[in-house]
Amino acid sequence: MSGYERKNTTANSITITKRKRNSISEQSENVYEKSNRKESITLKPHRSFTPGFSQRDCKPVRHSKSSLRRRRRTKEKISSSVEREWVFSANNFENLADKLVLVSYNLLGVDNASNHMDLYYNVPRKHLEWSRRKHLICKEISRYNASILCLQEVDRFDDLDVLLKNRGFRGVHKSRTGEASDGCAIFWKENLFELLDHQHIEFDKFGMRNNVAQLCVLEMNCEEDPKSKLRVRSSDPRRLVVGNIHVLFNPKRGDIKLGQVRLFLEKAYKLSQEWGNIPVAIAGDLNSTPQSAIYDFIASADLDTQLHDRRQISGQTEVEPKERSFRNHYAFSASASISGSLLNEWSQEELQLATGGQETTHVQHQLKLNSAYSGVPGTYRTRDQRGEPLATTYHSRFLGTVDYIWHTKELVPVRVLETLPADVLRRTGGLPSENWGSDHLAIACELGFVNDWQ
């Protein structure tokens, strides 16, 4: 073979090789595009919780114009294919006679959304319309077969009252004090419960801003007698205290946030004692992360304020709107070591608000509370190392968990509604979305009365 032929053959070989590579690349791209078009994201419950969430997922994300366009194009497709599933306790609670499903949901107040549009710059405007969201929220609640609802940021109570009454609920509402229009609401299924007592807390009366909380005593209605088909009242009816709270947001006022939680738990305990030491279930938006000192206070019933900077006690960090980014709660640790400088962060007034006393740095409560979600094994894609959801809210400045359900030992978590993986949430571009009517995800737990099981 001549030198010219060798060169020509080599050139042809290179050309063919390049064509093959291009063909392979084109095929890969076609397969990728097809797989994306057919993609269906379904959350499957794991049998056990496996820690190991990667810190690589914790970095703030800056959205370029091109990425925003891509997110908008794919958002409808992704959100429409996502499902949430129930995961069950490792214990067998199938034989429990008396159970209830408690749902906690921050609905995103209409006025709050309008006043903070920078948080939803990547959300299509139709997804923020209350006329659409209210129906989406009520349909979602119906899917969970809820017995009791603890709702926050409710500023259109009359709308909800009509829609939920049609679904068999009755409710009570308490607006925030001052100029704010939103508040809290507790609803219950009328055929399942009777309201025995109702109290509310206006925190401004205690010098702790205009937030509010609610406490209800509910009694389970009598079951139908299988022979007579009549309702028979039990000599020992099931009763419980249900608490609902929306804690102050301001991360710098950890003294007020801690004080609100303390007072709320004090009132819940007192009401439980007044009705014969009945079980307690509390829920709401605590504006505190699972890594925070406030979370530790609820779980352990004791906290030494001298160990913590009040500006970091809730575990939240602020991000400027111009940064167009979010912070994940699991990327931030709220703990602080003891130092003389930290002691100066708490004035006497701040200590009194937080602890309720004048000459103490410790804050305590008398309820022995367990987190519903940490009591049911989950997946590393949706849970942190404490078993709490990785994210219950997502907007342009925050992706993390601030919503919780807690219960006393007389109640056990039978199952919980798993949240969405953080990576799936990020790919939606932000909440609300096509399928989710708020910037928070509803959290839900089925609770059973423990003496039915033991």
UniProtKB/Swiss-Prot annotation:
Catalytic reactions on record: Exonucleolytic cleavage of poly(A) to 5'-AMP
Sequence segments annotated as region (Disordered): 1-76
Enzyme Commission no: 3.1.13.4
Binding site for Mg(2+): E153
Bias (Basic residues) ranges: 61-75
Keywords: Cytoplasm, Exonuclease, Hydrolase, Magnesium, Metal-binding, Nuclease, Nucleus, Repeat, RNA-binding, Transcription, Transcription regulation
Compositionally biased residues, Basic and acidic residues: 31-41
GO function term, MF aspect, one: poly(A)-specific ribonuclease activity
Keyword Cytoplasm: yes
Protein function: Acts as a catalytic component of the CCR4-NOT core complex, which in the nucleus seems to be a general transcription factor, and in the cytoplasm the major mRNA deadenylase involved in mRNA turnover.
Subunit structure: Component of the CCR4-NOT complex, at least composed of CRR4 and CAF1 proteins.
Family the UniProt entry places it in: Belongs to the CCR4/nocturin family.
Name under which the protein is recorded: Carbon catabolite repressor protein 4 homolog 5
Gene from which the chain derives: CCR4-5
